[in-house]
């Protein structure tokens, strides 16, 4: 059973310079909501508090008795029992003012974090997960300047930051990087005549042609990590991949890490909240407007 009702009263519009989505925007998980009711007696103490919505434990959220290994590790994004989920017609989503979620799909937001800042908890957690794959890489080319990729960049530690470069292809890319204070950039013209420059591509765009354009910039035995999904079916240069033993791997959502001293799994959502609470990264410049819920028209 779903056990919590939450209320949303403001929508924030993303900075349009970073928006690659075609068509209408609908609320996904990037939500901060207030708890207004719950059937869980123990959880009633949290009525009035704010939460972020995240897939932490799908098995418990949908009352699936045999909890999968991923949900036990707070990796609900990779739940092995997703096909067993049964949805009810009163959960709602989109631009709903009220919707129902399980407590296992939420994480309490500290009072110190403003709601408009809290909407970045989940996107930052995606960046944290991306960085997890890059610790051993020596020189990384980032393709695609977007909200997620910028949050990823801003949350990087010094060791990875020194190895990461955003690809700048257009004047628009250049202006965005300048406006958002992104210093780790490499211009398309500079690397066009170079070969085997990078050992990793982190792609936030998902375009076959764009990835193929830069395959020659990779050293043998390099890696391509795909985060973006613009092309429904990627068509990569398999000859180049095979002849240079280049591996391709997808990255999706957020994950967790095991804390040996505390004997528990700490989700990337929790790490993201700590980053925002500390003021380590700036996010205000990624919001262009705030819209009242009552002013939204379908």
Predicted regions and their residues:
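Glycine-rich beta-strand-centered segment in the early N-terminal region that forms part
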Residues: 6-69, 110-112
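Mid-domain Rossmann-like dinucleotide-binding core that forms the NAD(H)/NADP(H) cofactor-binding site
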Residues: 104, 111-189
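C-terminal substrate-binding/catalytic core of Rossmann-like NAD(P)-dependent dehydrogenases/reductases
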Residues: 234-288
């Amino acid at each position: 059973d779903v056990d919590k009702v939450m209320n949303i009263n403001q929508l924030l519009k993303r900075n349009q310079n970073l928006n690659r989505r075609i068509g209408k925007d609908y609320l996904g998980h990037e939500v901060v909501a207030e708890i207004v009711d719950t059937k869980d007696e123990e959880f009633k103490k949290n009525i009035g508090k704010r939460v972020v919505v995240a897939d932490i434990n799908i098995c418990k959220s949908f009352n699936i008795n045999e909890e999968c290994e991923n949900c036990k590790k707070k990796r609900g994004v990779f739940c092995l029992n997703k096909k067993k989920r049964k949805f009810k017609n009163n959960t709602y989503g989109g631009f709903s003012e009220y919707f129902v979620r399980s407590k296992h799909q939420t994480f309490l937001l500290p009072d110190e974090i403003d709601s408009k800042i809290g909407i970045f908890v989940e996107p930052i957690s995606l960046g944290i997960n991306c960085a997890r794959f890059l610790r051993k890489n020596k020189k990384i080319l980032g393709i695609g300047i977007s909200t997620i990729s910028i949050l990823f960049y801003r949350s990087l530690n010094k060791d990875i930051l020194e190895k990461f470069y955003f690809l700048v292809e257009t004047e628009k890319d250049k202006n965005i990087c300048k406006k958002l204070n992104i210093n780790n950039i490499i211009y398309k013209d500079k690397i066009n005549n170079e070969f085997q420059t990078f050992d990793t591509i982190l792609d936030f765009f998902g375009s076959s042609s764009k990835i193929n354009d830069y395959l020659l910039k990779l050293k043998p035995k390099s890696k391509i990590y795909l985060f973006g999904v613009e092309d429904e079916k990627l068509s990569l240069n398999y000859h180049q991949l095979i002849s240079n033993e280049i591996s391709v791997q997808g990255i999706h959502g957020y994950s967790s890490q095991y804390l040996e001293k505390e004997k528990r799994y700490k989700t990337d959502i929790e790490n993201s909240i700590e980053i925002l609470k500390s003021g380590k990264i700036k996010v205000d410049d990624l919001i262009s407007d705030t819209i009242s819920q009552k002013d939204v028209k379908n």
